[in-house]
Each structure stands twice: as C-alpha cells, then as structure tokens.
Amino acid sequence: MARTLVAGVDTSTQSCKVRVTDAETGELVRFGQAKHPNGTSVDPSYWWSAFQEAAEQAGGLDDVSALAVGGQQHGMVILDNQGNVIRDAMLWNDTSSAPQAAALIEKLGAAPAQDGEPEDPIARGKQRWVKAVGSSPVASYTLTKVAWVAENEPENAKKIAAICLPHDWLSWRIAGYGPVTEGEDAHLEALFTDRSDAPAPSTTMPRRTNTAAT
C-alpha cells in the first residue's frame, strides 16, 4: 500500500526549507533548502524562487497529499488590488518604524485616564492598545511598518488593497489564490481583533475591513 506523504515549508528569514514526511510514521523522506537574500527588506519574488529550488531539491511535490507553510513573523508585504507587490517587503528586523510605533502609542494614550487606567500617557496608550488588539506596537510589528509607509511613501500607501506576512504571501503563490492569513497571525501583528467592544486605534491609514489580508 502506498504511503501518504505530506510536506512542511519553512520560509524563514535566512532560507526556505521543504521537508517531505511520511504522514503515518513521521519519517523524513526528502528534504530541500535554498537561501534567501540577506538584509532587512527583500523582494518577495526571491521567496518564490527559493521555494521552487527547495521543492526541486526535495524531489518535487507532485506526490504530496497536503502541504503547510510557516515562517518568519512581523514582516510586511503590501499588495495592490491586482495582487501585485507594491514595494520590497519590510522584514521583522527592519526597525525604521520605531518612531511610528511610539506615535501610535502616544496617540491612543492622549485622552484622559479612565477608571483604573495609568496616569502616565505612554503606559495608558500601551494598555489601550493591548485592550484593543492584544498587543502594543513595537518597531518589528507589521502595523508600524504600514504606518511608516503611509508617512514616508504616501503614493505606495494609496495603492494598498491587502497586507500580509511573508509566509502568507508564499501560501498564496503556492495555492494559486488568496491572499490569506491566520487570525492569530493578524492578531499578533496588531492588525486584527475579535472583540466587538474594543476601541478602534487610529493609524495614518484609513480603517478598512481587509487591513489584514483574509
């Protein structure tokens, strides 16, 4: 009886790895790996090329029954309404959006303290962000990078139709449709909340229902 094979794809900061495994036993059957470019920003097309190379090294995926993709967090891939990449992806290790992170916290903390809230406006802003989306903005987060684009590249910001993480983009390319993301990933990037009573943190981008690609 033919065994069932599944594949795992890890599109990390440094490389793409493809692992083909026996679904029943967990035995490693084949493996491939290809490097990604160094740096804090990258053209997503390199991720696709690396995936193709790694998949070829792993003997191809034609006999695989299922495939899952995971990878680096906190990157920003912005797409237009045709699904085209607007600019190089800003990775988690790009900290140029630190001023935007601070500004987002300051803005949400500006209103007077309510019952039980800290008197310090920065602490208050962080607390309100956590209440709204589960985390407080830092320079590595996707949201702050979007705010950076809005402030520094307004023409690119106007083109944004969807925002996704690096492995979301690769999942879309592999599946042939999308873009997609997990709710948990969007939540970690301060892009999503499942709370109907949460305050609406304002950024320099208009609020829209597809802020996180779905």
Can you say where each PLM-predicted feature lies in the sequence?
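Gly/Ser/Thr-rich active-site cleft segment
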Residues: 11-13, 115, 129-214
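N-terminal glycine/serine-rich phosphate-binding loop of ATP-dependent small-molecule kinases
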Residues: 1-88, 99, 131, 159
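Structural signal for hydrophobic packing residues in well-ordered secondary-structure cores
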Residues: 24, 55, 59-62, 105-112, ...
